[in-house]
């Protein structure tokens, strides 16, 4: 299993006002690999990650998953996006009226788990990040760091094949950031997932199999 990014370009605007943001991005990520995207603000990192997740269309280029187009209009590709890609954003976006456990079991049930399976997975993942005591808490009862850790667990609930993360440790202290990255990496390795994460925290680079540096829409360390 691999993710192949082939000559991805993205521009915003039209005609003479068109602004290129990505200028031909190429790289591969194999199963079990954890890749970090790094670069200054405006380098194109978030645009690239958003395209990889299917939330934004590229202007040109291809994204292949197991040598097949990742994003098409057919039903199989839609199911892949729903069930096999896990997103972790800077903000947690938790549902305010659901308790922590329900935030997770809802995702599990949507992915086809039984309630028992969803409960077990939620409890296992929360224990790994030290939040098993917060099962019945509502989002407003959590700290910013706790909310983000719940969001990370939520992205892992449905056993995704691809994890895309945008600064997932930005609201965490150094100790918790390390715990979370170790958890994400262990999941990627043990479940043979593909992991791509944006971070500015160079202390976390050592956990990556490779670091891709972007500058002004191009990869500079290819």
Curated annotation (Swiss-Prot):
It is a peripheral membrane protein. ATP binds at residues 39-46. Signal peptide: none annotated. GO terms for cellular component: plasma membrane. The keyword Transport applies. It is found in: Cell membrane. Its main location: membrane. It is an enzyme of class 7 (translocase). Residues 3-222 form the ABC transporter domain. One of its GO terms (molecular function) is ATP binding. Its EC number is 7.6.2.-. Keywords: ATP-binding, Cell membrane, Membrane, Nucleotide-binding, Translocase, Transport. The complex is composed of two ATP-binding proteins (HrtA), two transmembrane proteins (HrtB) and a solute-binding protein. Belongs to the ABC transporter superfamily. HrtA family. Part of the ABC transporter complex hrt involved in hemin import. Responsible for energy coupling to the transport system. This is Putative hemin import ATP-binding protein HrtA. The gene is hrtA.
């Amino acid at each position: 299993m691999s993710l192949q990014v082939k000559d991805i370009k993205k521009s915003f605007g039209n005609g003479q006002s068109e602004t290129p943001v990505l200028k031909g991005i190429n790289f591969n990520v194999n199963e079990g690999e954890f890749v970090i995207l790094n670069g200054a603000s405006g380098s194109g990192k978030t645009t690239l990650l958003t395209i990889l997740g299917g939330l934004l269309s590229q202007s040109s280029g291809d994204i292949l998953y197991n040598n097949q187009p990742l994003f098409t209009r057919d039903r199989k590709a839609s199911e892949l996006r729903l069930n096999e890609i896990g997103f972790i954003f800077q903000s947690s976006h938790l549902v305010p009226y659901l308790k922590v456990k329900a935030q997770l079991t809802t995702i599990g049930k949507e992915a086809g788990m039984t309630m028992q399976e969803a409960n077990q997975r939620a409890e296992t993942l929360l224990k790994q990040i030290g939040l098993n005591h917060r099962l019945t808490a509502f989002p407003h009862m959590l700290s910013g760091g706790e909310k983000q850790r719940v969001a990370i667990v939520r992205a892992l609930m449905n056993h995704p094949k691809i994890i895309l993360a945008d600064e997932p440790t930005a609201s965490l202290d150094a100790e918790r950031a390390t715990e979370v990255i170790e958890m994400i990496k262990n999941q990627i390795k043990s479940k043979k997932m593909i992991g791509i994460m944006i971070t500015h925290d160079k202390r976390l680079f050592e956990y990556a199999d490779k670091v891709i540096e972007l500058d002004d829409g191009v990869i500079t360390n290819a």
